[in-house]
């Protein structure tokens, strides 16, 4: 009986020291810990997002071989930008892609052939400079995108000035060749006849795929072309060297090429949104807005989905990376551990002005995070 009384006294003493157990207090402490963890994760993601944006600026300038962003005003862009239908369609295409809120399938369609449009503007030619009577236009240099892919379409676009009365226009495209013994410096490419009504000028396209393919096979034969568009009175209506008020009406080439696929499938990574509570390495959405940067020199896209990686790389989830796991096991204090980083990236196509106020179309590699992982 005395032993039982002693146990009761001890039990009551322990309750007095420990105090009452408040279940609500324990729940609040647990909730505070969870909230603190979520806040830390949000802060970590925000830092990763800011770092990604700054890295994108540096990467674009570096990959375009630009020391600084070209300083071109919006007014200058309006004057220099070609006002032709295919370029407008290309810009509209970027707008459609931008407005599409869906991120597409998680599976890359690298198996199917993709078609790309390349807009090539005329440049200076040493041969044209040597010709005594300066021809009316045009020399085109071709990027590696055109040289190393299959050309499926090539259109020369020219702008015809408006006429005051109905007239028939005879359009002639001539290819420059090295002077022959009889003095001939041209050979015909295409000719066509079209009727024009009074009013605004028109854009006219001419198929030059065969000529372009010959130039690609024999680059030394590419000496330039001459463009003529004579009305019934012998007036040339073709804009070859734009006069004041004709900005953006230069001739140009629209070339469509097929890009050969390299892979068919890829494995998957985690995709999250900004409200996700996922702690593991994950891909998060990030939209880059070039207008917010003040980068008006980028014609298209004005914004694009770049994405970024954030999250923890716990060794519990590293069955896929046995080498990293073994290194950590051998020297846990000396190894920094894996980081959440892009494991697959894809390019973006871009229309932009370079430092010489020339319009360039190019593909910039490694600008979109497609997948994140621990490595």
UniProtKB/Swiss-Prot annotation:
Processing and modification events after translation: Synthesized as large precursor molecule that undergoes proteolytic cleavage to generate an N-terminal propeptide and a disulfide linked C-terminal dimer, which is the biologically active molecule. The circulating form consists of a latent complex of the C-terminal dimer and other proteins, including its propeptide, which maintain the C-terminal dimer in a latent, inactive state. Ligand activation requires additional cleavage of the prodomain by a tolloid-like metalloproteinase.
Keyword Glycoprotein applies: yes
SMART domains hit by this protein: TGFB (SM00204)
Protein's recorded name: Growth/differentiation factor 8
Entry keywords, A to Z: Cleavage on pair of basic residues, Cytokine, Disulfide bond, Glycoprotein, Growth factor, Heparin-binding, Secreted, Signal
CDD domains per UniProt: TGF_beta_GDF8 (cd19388)
Organism: Sylvicapra grimmia (Grey duiker)
Sugar-modified residues: 48, 71
InterPro entries xrefs: Cystine-knot_cytokine (IPR029034), TGF-b_C (IPR001839), TGF-b_propeptide (IPR001111), TGF-beta-rel (IPR015615), TGFb_CS (IPR017948)
Record-stated family: Belongs to the TGF-beta family.
A Pfam family this chain is assigned to: TGF_beta
Residues that make up the propeptide removed upon maturation: 19-266
């Amino acid at each position: 009986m005395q032993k039982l009384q002693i146990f009761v006294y001890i039990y009551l003493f322990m309750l007095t020291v420990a105090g009452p157990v408040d279940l609500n207090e324990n729940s609040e402490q647990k909730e505070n810990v969870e909230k603190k963890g979520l806040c830390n994760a949000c802060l970590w993601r925000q830092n990763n997002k800011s770092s990604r944006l700054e890295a994108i600026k540096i990467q674009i300038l570096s990959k375009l071989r630009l020391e600084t962003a070209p300083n071109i005003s919006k007014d200058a862009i309006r004057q220099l930008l070609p006002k032709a239908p295919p370029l407008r369609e290309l810009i509209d295409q970027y707008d459609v892609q931008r407005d599409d809120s869906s991120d597409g399938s998680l599976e890359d369609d690298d198996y199917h052939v993709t078609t790309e449009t390349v807009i090539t503007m005329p440049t200076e030619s040493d041969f044209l400079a040597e010709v005594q009577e300066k021809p009316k236009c045009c020399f085109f240099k071709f990027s590696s995108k055109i040289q190393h892919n299959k050309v499926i379409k090539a259109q020369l676009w020219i702008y015809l000035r408006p006429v005051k009365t109905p007239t028939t226009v005879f359009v002639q495209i001539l290819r420059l060749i090295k002077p022959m013994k009889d003095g001939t410096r041209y050979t015909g490419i295409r000719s066509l006849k079209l009727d024009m009504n009074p009013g605004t000028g028109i854009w006219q396209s001419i198929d030059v795929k065969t000529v372009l393919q010959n130039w690609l096979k024999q680059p030394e034969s590419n000496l330039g072309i001459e463009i003529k568009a004579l009305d019934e009175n012998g007036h040339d209506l073709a804009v070859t060297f734009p006069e004041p008020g004709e900005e953006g009406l230069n001739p140009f080439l629209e070339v469509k090429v097929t890009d050969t696929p390299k892979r068919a499938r890829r494995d998957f990574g985690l995709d999250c949104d900004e409200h996700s509570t996922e702690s593991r390495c994950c891909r998060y959405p990030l939209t880059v807005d070039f207008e917010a940067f003040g980068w008006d020199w980028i014609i298209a896209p004005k914004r694009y989905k770049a994405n970024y990686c954030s999250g923890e790389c716990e060794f519990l989830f590293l069955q896929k990376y046995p080498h990293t796991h073994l290194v950590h096991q051998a020297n846990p204090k000396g190894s920094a551990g894996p980081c959440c980083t892009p494991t697959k990236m894809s390019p973006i196509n871009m229309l932009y002005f370079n430092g010489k106020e020339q319009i360039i179309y190019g593909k910039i590699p490694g600008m979109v995070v497609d997948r994140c992982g621990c490595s």
